[in-house]
UniProtKB/Swiss-Prot annotation:
Belongs to the universal ribosomal protein uL11 family. This is Large ribosomal subunit protein uL11. One of its GO terms (biological process) is translation. One of its GO terms (molecular function) is structural constituent of ribosome. InterPro entries: Ribosomal_uL11, Ribosomal_uL11_bac-typ, Ribosomal_uL11_C, Ribosomal_uL11_C_sf, Ribosomal_uL11_CS, Ribosomal_uL11_N, Ribosomal_uL11_N_sf. SMART domains: RL11 (SM00649). It comes from the Bacteria. Keywords: Methylation, Ribonucleoprotein, Ribosomal protein, RNA-binding, rRNA-binding. One or more lysine residues are methylated.
Length: 142
């Protein structure tokens, strides 16, 4: 018989740097999950990734206090900031530009994030990433 699901927890956890401090500790502690067990499992699963990269994580907590977790690719904004070599996007995207990214860079990011995007083909995924870049105040060049 399948385990009964008690709830889901969605967090953005830095790769290889999960520790029991907030926000991870309180979120898992409320559900009665063993925090250190999650931290060790998460850090082991993300040790090959760039340290500190934000990883969207969905933790499924079962009624017997056990859990499973699924990780997704980092947010598009993380990749775009890295490609444009900037610390943060523009606070007024329609008026000032924070930097530039090429369509080729958008395509690379779309290839990396394709499974997490709601797109049927790579061209649609590239357009989604280019739209994200524009909303961050980045200029998209051909």
């Amino acid at each position: 018989m399948a385990k009964k699901i008690a709830g889901y927890i969605k967090l953005q956890v830095p790769a290889g740097a999960a520790n029991p401090s907030p926000p991870i500790g309180p979120a898992l502690g409320q559900r009665g999950v063993n925090i250190m067990e999650f931290c060790k499992a998460f850090n082991a699963k993300t040790q090959e990734m760039e340290k500190g990269m934000p990883i969207p994580t969905t933790i499924t907590v079962f009624s017997d206090k056990s859990f499973t977790f699924a990780i997704a690719t980092p947010p598009a904004s993380f990749f775009l900031k890295k490609a444009a070599k900037i610390a943060k996007g523009s606070s007024t995207p329609s008026q000032t530009t924070a930097g530039t990214v090429s369509m080729a860079q958008c395509r690379e990011i779309a290839e990396a994030k394709f499974n997490d995007l709601n797109a049927n083909d790579l061209d649609q995924a590239t357009k989604i990433i280019a739209g994200s870049a524009r909303s961050m105040g980045l200029q998209v060049t051909e």
